[in-house]
Regions:
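N-terminal low-complexity, acidic/polar interaction/targeting segments
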Residues: 1-134
Length: 134
């Protein structure tokens, strides 16, 4: 499990989510991302000043174009690499920690979306990763 997250109880109860079709993060894997939209730049800033956690999740066909429906399952990633470019973009790498079921979406005042994740079904993800490394 990524640094500091040895069990699901170590993970935050609320997470920002980055709905991005075609980008899949799995526990123990890495996902490089180029962040350029202002709302997601803000999300990364907030993540870097806190838990360094971002939930990657796919979208489904429904919902508004600017607020698409979220898939049921995503994966929490920890920002393990971070760089700023001269033109204002961020280059980050997320390392997958644990899958989650997207619970209640919070009605909040941030430009990005946040959910209350349910890690229960995937509580063994951190242990599975550790076992593979041994």
């Amino acid at each position: 499990m990524a640094a500091g997250y040895r069990k699901v109880t170590d993970l935050p109860e609320l997470i920002p989510v980055f709905p991005l079709d075609g980008a899949l993060l799995l526990p123990g894997c890495q996902l490089p991302l180029q962040i350029f939209e202002p709302r997601y730049l803000n999300m990364v800033d907030d993540a870097m000043s806190g838990h360094r956690i971002i939930g990657m999740i796919q979208t489904t066909g429904g919902g508004d174009r600017t607020r698409p429906s979220l898939a049921e399952v995503g994966c929490v990633g920890r920002v393990t690499a971070y760089a700023e470019t001269g033109d204002g973009r961020y280059l980050i790498t997320l390392t997958g920690v644990c899958r989650f079921v997207a619970g209640d979406e919070l009605d909040i005042n941030t430009p990005y979306r946040q959910v209350r994740p349910d890690y229960g079904r995937f509580a063994s993800d951190p242990d599975d990763e550790r076992a593979q490394l041994q």
